[in-house]
């Protein structure tokens, strides 16, 4: 049984799988294939970018018994060295390979006519693959955590087939699905059933990835890391700092010489409701992680009307308190040149109840944060994507383009660039920059990290090598720098 996995890339509210990230999807699928009896050497993995660049891969697909395509973007993104698969490309694959292809991932939420096919998995693609190989069944179902326990370990070795291995970031899942009773109007995470993995299972997966050569990890596949293994009490659910400490300690023991351990996704409401537990968790993260970490918070809007109409759960005063707590614990500078742990804020436009006043509300929130001397490592301003399965999908909100782009540029100029000058002042040595592309007389590079800064290094330098550089200037989300001699400890 020869199988080919095509990684068309995924980007979801609580999962990133666009290179240099590799999401859990292709790893679980490879594990399901091996668990079903396939030999590891017969499981092939290619990214969509590889396929475009190397026509020979089509011949391998032609000879395969099963082709599995992972794809889907449910949040908008811009990528430096990757182009996600297009609907047209998926349609071409379906037409060419017909009964021997399966397609899945968040692309299942698309309502494009070309995807109205029995080969598109409406639930978990990895479960559909396993059942097809073991039971000859084509019934859609959700996978079980006991299956992921096996598949995550058995499929870990597939990362060695990635074209950028070992310089890839492994996205790690702790749980998925939103545990809230009322969900944000736009989010696709509630469309997954809520399921939580055991700590030992996550650690075992990290160990398997590490033994396969992985050195870069992000605990990012969950909507709120601070709520992982939360405890039920008489007054509701509260975070469990002991569980987070066990998770991080276990990962460090399983991967003793890892180079990056970062996180993603923090619900600021957790901090507001449980500040003591949240502070303890943040301290644990700083103890075990690597510097340059970002706790991205889904604020989405500070307009009271928008907050109410879209089931958001946090108001401006609460946002500021959450930002203060993360700054208090994590703003000290780390050994790689960047602060240990800083918050990020996501702002979303095109929500119900939005007006011109919304833009002013959001700008005022960011100005207040800046005036307090607090730092935000990232401000992510984006337009909402609509899916029929979500409440927002039933409405249409007009976004005035000129207003949106003017607002975004204002935030860059007034907030982001001044903060970036504090986060990485001139003269700061940024370490472990991987050079990725050329742009005029500059070489573009980034650290392998969660939300890495783009660094424009003077000179045309060799690509795909690590280097250190000294900061010489600042712009929105990027630094200019000059190369410096790497330290002996790097």
What would you call each of these model-derived segments?
Residues 2-201:
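Acidic, low-complexity intrinsically disordered segments
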Residues 111-116, 276-282, 351-370:
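Catalytic cores of alpha/beta
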Residues 178, 202, 297, 379, ...:
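Conserved, mostly hydrophobic/aromatic
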Residues 4-6, 207-354:
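Conserved SAM/AdoMet-binding glycine-rich loop
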Residues 67, 101, 120, 217-220, ...:
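Hydrophobic residues within beta-strands of alpha/beta enzymes
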Residues 400-490:
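Terminal RNA-binding accessory module
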Residues 13, 77, 108-111, 182, ...:
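Flexible glycine/acidic-rich beta-alpha junction loops that bind and position SAM and/or redox cofactors
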Residues 87-90, 202, 244, 278, ...:
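Aromatic/hydrophobic pocket-lining residues that form the small-molecule binding cavity
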């Amino acid at each position: 049984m020869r199988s080919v996995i095509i990684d068309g890339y995924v980007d979801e509210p609580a999962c990133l799988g666009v290179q240099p990230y590799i999401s859990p999807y292709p790893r679980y699928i490879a594990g399901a294939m091996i668990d079903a009896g396939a030999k590891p050497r017969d499981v092939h993995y290619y990214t969509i970018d590889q396929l475009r660049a190397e026509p020979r891969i089509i011949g391998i697909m032609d000879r395969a018994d099963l082709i599995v395509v992972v794809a889907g973007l449910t949040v908008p993104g811009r990528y430096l060295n990757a182009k996600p698969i297009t609907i047209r490309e998926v349609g071409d694959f379906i037409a060419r390979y017909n009964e021997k292809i399966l397609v899945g991932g968040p692309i299942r939420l698309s309502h494009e006519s070309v995807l109205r096919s029995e080969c598109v998995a409406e639930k978990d693609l990895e479960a559909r693959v396993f059942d097809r190989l073991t039971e000859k069944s084509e019934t859609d179902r959700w996978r079980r955590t006991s299956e992921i326990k096996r598949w995550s370990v058995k499929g870990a070795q597939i990362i060695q087939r990635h074209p950028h291995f070992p310089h890839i970031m492994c996205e790690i899942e702790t749980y998925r699905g939103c545990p809230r009773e009322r969900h944000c109007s736009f989010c696709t995470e509630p469309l997954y059933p809520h399921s939580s993995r055991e700590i030992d299972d996550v650690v075992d997966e990290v160990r398997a990835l590490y033994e396969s050569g992985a050195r870069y990890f992000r605990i990012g596949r969950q909507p709120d890391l601070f709520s992982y293994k939360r405890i039920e009490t008489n007054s509701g659910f509260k975070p469990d700092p002991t569980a987070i400490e066990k998770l991080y300690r276990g990962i460090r023991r399983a991967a003793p010489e890892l180079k990056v351990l970062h996180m993603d996704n923090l619900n600021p409401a957790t901090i507001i409701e449980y500040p003591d537990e949240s502070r303890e968790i943040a301290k644990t993260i700083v103890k075990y992680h690597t510097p340059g970490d970002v706790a991205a918070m889904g604020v989405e809007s500070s307009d009271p009307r928008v907050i109410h109409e879209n089931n958001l759960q946090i108001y401006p005063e609460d946002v500021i308190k959450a930002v203060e707590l993360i700054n208090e614990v994590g703003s000290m500078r780390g050994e790689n040149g960047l602060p240990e742990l800083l918050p990020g804020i996501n702002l979303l436009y095109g929500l119900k109840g939005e007006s011109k006043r919304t833009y002013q509300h959001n700008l005022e929130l960011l100005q207040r944060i800046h005036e307090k001397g607090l730092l935000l490592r990232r401000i992510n301003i984006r337009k909402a994507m609509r899916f029929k399965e979500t409440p927002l999908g039933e409405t249409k909100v007009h976004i005035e383009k000129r207003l949106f782009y003017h607002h975004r540029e204002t935030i860059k100029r007034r907030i982001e660039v001044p903060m970036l000058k504090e986060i990485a002042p001139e003269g700061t040595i940024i370490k472990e920059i991987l050079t990725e592309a050329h742009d005029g007389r500059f070489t573009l590079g980034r650290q392998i990290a969660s939300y890495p800064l783009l660094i424009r290094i003077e000179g045309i330098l060799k690509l795909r090598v690590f280097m250190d550089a000294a900061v010489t200037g600042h712009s929105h989300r990027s630094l200019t720098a000059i190369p410096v001699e790497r330290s002996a400890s790097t």
